[in-house]
């Protein structure tokens, strides 16, 4: 049985901290599976006509999270999607009712590598602080238990090519589908 057949239209939701590769790996997965790629942050910008930093500035994080939940609810009603989510989508418990309609994949990248990837990125409102490393570590501490609720954890090291990460995900999905009754996420190390 092919992987696409085994998935039977099940959406793949990529979660992880900002800079973890959700966009890059999401596009690769979608292309490989013949799925449609969707980025929740891009959808939020399209729906509101504002950038993420503008939404944070005018509506605060709480306002942004409400819009994010509405967008996720809509996205979850479709099938055959690979969805790159915003890093904080796991915070709101109600979002899990939508995420769990698909296969949730946590892209787990070490903090130093995330900082390297995000250096100079002005489109990350939560990192516009005097100490981005401290902020990123705090976000990790706040969200780690939520990310751990994913069906699959993929540990990614700095030197790993996104194509390799995509292949590792594709190779392990069948066993995750087979063992979906298990409550702990499968873990794939590099």
Curated annotation (Swiss-Prot):
UniProt: Mg(2+) binding residues: 23
Protein localization: Cytoplasm
Pathway entry: Metabolic intermediate biosynthesis; chorismate biosynthesis; chorismate from D-erythrose 4-phosphate and phosphoenolpyruvate: step 5/7
Disulfide cysteine pairs (residue numbers): none
Enzyme superclass (EC): transferase
Chemical reaction(s) catalysed: shikimate + ATP = 3-phosphoshikimate + ADP + H(+)
Alphabetized CDD domains for the sequence: SK (cd00464)
E.C. numbers: 2.7.1.71
Binding site for substrate: 41, 65, 87, 143
Keywords, ordered alphabetically: Amino-acid biosynthesis, Aromatic amino acid biosynthesis, ATP-binding, Cytoplasm, Kinase, Magnesium, Metal-binding, Nucleotide-binding, Transferase
Cofactor binding: number and manner: Binds 1 Mg(2+) ion per subunit.
Residues binding ATP, per UniProt: 19-24, 124
One GO process term, biological-process aspect: amino acid biosynthetic process
Keyword Metal-binding: yes
Gene3D superfamilies according to UniProt: P-loop containing nucleotide triphosphate hydrolases (3.40.50.300)
Entry protein name: Shikimate kinase
């Amino acid at each position: 049985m092919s992987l696409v057949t085994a998935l039977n239209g099940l959406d793949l939701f990529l979660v992880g901290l900002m800079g973890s590769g959700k966009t890059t790996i999401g596009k690769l997965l979608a292309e490989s599976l013949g799925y449609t790629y969707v980025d929740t942050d891009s959808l939020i910008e399209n729906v509101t006509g504002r950038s993420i930093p503008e939404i944070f500035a005018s509506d605060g994080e709480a306002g942004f999270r409400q819009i994010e939940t509405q967008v996720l609810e809509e996205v979850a009603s479709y099938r055959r999607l690979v969805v790159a989510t915003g890093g904080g989508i796991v915070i709101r418990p109600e979002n899990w009712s939508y995420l769990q309609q698909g296969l949730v994949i946590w892209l787990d990248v070490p903090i130093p590598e995330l900082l390297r990837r995000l250096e100079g990125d002005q489109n990350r409102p939560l990192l516009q602080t005097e100490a981005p490393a401290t902020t990123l570590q705090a976000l990790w501490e706040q969200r780690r238990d939520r990310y751990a609720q994913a069906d699959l954890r993929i540990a990614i090291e700095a030197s790993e090519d996104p194509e390799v990460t995509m292949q590792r995900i594709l190779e392990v999905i069948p066993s995750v589908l087979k063992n979906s009754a298990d409550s702990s996420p499968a873990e794939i190390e590099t």
